[in-house]
């Protein structure tokens, strides 16, 4: 063997080239033959082979169930040379009402659960085709699609199904190929049909108009989609992310208690793991106030019950569950499908257009097939009519012939018939020689000729093809259409900490030495005129005192003004809570104030209204009025509230309505009073005017 010339049975190759070629072959095999659906029928090869094998095995929806192992064997042996587990898993998903929006397989037995339980072994479960699967294969015998050789070229299998329903959208698809993935959500059949009809009526329709019919995904598990931005992005670009939130209600119980009842969870969320995660959050102290957690789901539907203490706000607990568990989840949409054997990311209109083009080809091929059959029948009927018109001569010709072949040849020569017509005459029963039977032949011939005219007109007019598609779609909508399960909410409900905190009245205290704390108003109670009050001390030592004390709520904004003219912003709930006698937290640990910077004013603000103002005064007698709305952008790192001269300090700030009377007083007992309107509003960084 000469390795240099390549003679013999071994050829030298570069391993880099061979690895590149082999990997590309493998990648394309996964992309085209396993992981991605065809845009026309919405099926991956394994699903297409399962449905076709079930039809070939006579497993129609009105026939008895057959063992799942039987169809797995049919698929493996004839069409799909892969593992039996992968085929059975695909069958199981087609039969799970929590995985597939419109079931393709009617399963009998244990096919798993939303808790993540596996289906029973294939030797125990039984299956047959669902009605939707039957219409996917309807007219396949009429040469509507191309057939290709199977893996060993011993049989033929369809390269695509006729797909009378748009399966890619109504059931969606998910798959991971090499270097790409698809994740198409299921949709409501009635809405998709309405969108297709809109496209048939107006081929120039834009995606926003289509979205008036196809409003968004419709998951088999229901739940609620938050916002439309992710849907709009997916429909226009082929990619988007939608947030799905569980359907939950708060129900009252005895003794002022409440419970949260979850009846629908996001798509593809494991219910058992969801409940485990809630229990773990309670155990870890992340969520407090839950006294009982149980799963009351049964054949009537899902029901997860979360019982709460009577001293918690149910909405807050529910928001915490949304925040920390899969009760709120995201679904990343990637509308990737095979178009002419090549993977493409498609928008909503492109998917609908490709489906309609496929249906036009199916209808056209079916019409050609039916036209050929009709012409064949007309040809036979013409021969029978000739025979009946010359009945005596035909009978004599047949009687005088020695055998059937001679009789056939004689009929062809004497009456100018084709061999098929002559054979039909010989096959005709004597009862058809009666007058009534002759009329039936004449009537059938008229009907067949009308059918031929109609079929030819369909082939000549694309609008008639579209009308047929429209009629078929409306029939599918009437037969399989149902109400939307997933609720679409225009409220994006982007959750922040405030959603998770109950709004309650609080008392905020800042001491002279710069310690701050928050207490609930429940720590204080009304006392009569002679009451001695309660200790609200700042620790064990009595060397500190309260300098600022005011009422607010956990949701209010607290603006901290310093002597250096800066302002800092915190939410009420962000201030650390402490007991009545506790010292509190050093304010330098809460706010990024500089050395020598002190809090001189604290203003609680519910809303930043344009008709309210911050009125400021400095130790040099400068005053300034600034619109409250200018402080709405206040960041935790602080903003300039007033520009100060050297050695000047901000000493006071008050919230006004713009029409107040202002009094400035000095330590020497001199005061001035003036109308606030005498001071014009200035920007945040302005210095102010002489007071």
Give the ranges of each region predicted by the language model:
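Catalytic phosphate-handling regions of large nucleic-acid enzymes and associated NTPases
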Residues: 1-243, 303-305, 529-538, 543, ...
């Amino acid at each position: 063997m000469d390795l240099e010339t390549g003679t013999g049975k071994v050829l030298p190759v570069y391993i880099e080239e061979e690895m590149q070629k082999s990997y590309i072959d493998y990648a394309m095999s996964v992309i085209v033959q396993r992981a991605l659906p065809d845009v026309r029928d919405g099926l991956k090869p394994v699903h297409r082979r399962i449905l076709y094998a079930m039809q070939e095995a006579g497993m129609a929806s009105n026939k008895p169930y057959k063992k799942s192992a039987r169809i797995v064997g049919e698929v493996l042996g004839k069409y799909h040379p892969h593992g039996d587990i992968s085929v059975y898993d695909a069958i199981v998903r087609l039969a799970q009402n929590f995985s597939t929006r419109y079931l393709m397989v009617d399963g009998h037995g244990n096919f798993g659960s939303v808790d993540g339980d596996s289906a029973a072994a294939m030797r125990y479960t039984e299956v047959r085709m669902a009605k939707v699967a039957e219409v996917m294969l309807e007219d396949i015998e009429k040469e509507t699609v191309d057939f290709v050789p199977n893996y060993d070229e011993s049989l033929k299998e369809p390269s695509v199904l006729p797909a009378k329903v748009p399966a890619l959208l109504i059931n969606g698809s998910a798959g991971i190929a090499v270097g790409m993935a698809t994740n198409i959500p299921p949709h409501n059949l009635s809405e998709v049909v309405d969108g297709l009809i809109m496209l048939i009526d107006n081929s120039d329709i834009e995606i926003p108009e289509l979205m008036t019919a196809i409003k968004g995904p419709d998951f088999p598990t229901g739940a609620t989609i938050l916002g439309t931005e992710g849907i709009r992005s997916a429909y226009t670009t082929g990619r988007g992310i939608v947030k799905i939130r569980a359907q939950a209600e708060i129900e009252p119980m005895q003794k002022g208690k409440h419970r949260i009842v979850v009846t629908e969870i996001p798509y593809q969320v494991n219910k058992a793991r969801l409940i485990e995660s809630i229990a773990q959050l309670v155990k870890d102290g992340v969520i407090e106030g839950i006294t009982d957690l149980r799963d009351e789901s049964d054949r009537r539907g899902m029901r997860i019950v979360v019982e709460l203490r009577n001293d918690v706000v149910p909405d807050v607990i529910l928001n915490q569950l949304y925040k920390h568990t899969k009760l709120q989840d995201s679904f990343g949409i990637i509308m990737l499908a095979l178009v002419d054997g090549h993977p493409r990311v498609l928008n909503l209109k492109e998917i609908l257009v490709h489906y309609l083009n496929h249906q036009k080809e199916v209808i056209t091929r079916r019409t050609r097939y039916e036209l050929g059959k009709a012409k064949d029948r007309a040809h036979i009927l013409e021969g029978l009519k000739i025979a009946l018109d010359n009945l005596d001569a035909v009978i004599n010709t047949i009687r005088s012939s020695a055998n059937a072949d001679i009789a056939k040849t004689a009929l062809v020569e004497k009456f100018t018939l084709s061999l098929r017509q002559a054979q039909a005459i010989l096959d005709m029963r004597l009862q058809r020689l009666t007058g009534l039977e002759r009329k039936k032949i004449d009537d059938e011939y008229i009907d067949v000729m009308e059918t031929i005219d109609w079929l030819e007109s369909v082939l000549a007019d694309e609008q008639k093809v579209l009308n047929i598609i429209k009629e078929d779609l409306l029939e599918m909508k009437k037969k399989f259409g149902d109400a939307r399960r997933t609720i679409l909410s225009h409220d994006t409900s982007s959750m922040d900490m405030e959603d998770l905190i109950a709004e309650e009245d609080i008392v905020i205290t800042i001491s002279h030495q710069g310690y701050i704390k928050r207490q609930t108003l429940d720590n204080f109670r009304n006392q009569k005129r002679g009451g001695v009050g309660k200790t609200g001390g700042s620790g064990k030592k009595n060397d500190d005192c309260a300098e600022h004390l005011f009422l607010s709520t956990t949701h209010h904004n607290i603006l901290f003004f310093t002597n250096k003219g800066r302002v800092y912003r915190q939410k009420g709930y962000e201030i650390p809570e402490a007991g009545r006698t506790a010292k509190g937290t050093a304010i330098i640990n809460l706010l990024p104030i500089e050395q020598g910077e002190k809090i001189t004013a604290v203003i609680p603000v519910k809303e930043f209204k344009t008709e309210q103002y911050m009125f400021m005064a400095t130790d040099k007698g400068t005053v300034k009025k600034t619109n409250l709305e200018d402080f709405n952008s206040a960041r935790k790192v602080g903003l300039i509230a007033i520009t100060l001269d050297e050695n000047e300090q901000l000493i006071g700030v008050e919230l006004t309505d713009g029409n107040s009377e202002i009094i400035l007083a000095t330590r020497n007992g001199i005061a001035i009073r003036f109308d606030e309107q005498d001071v014009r509003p200035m920007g945040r960084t302005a210095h102010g005017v002489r007071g």
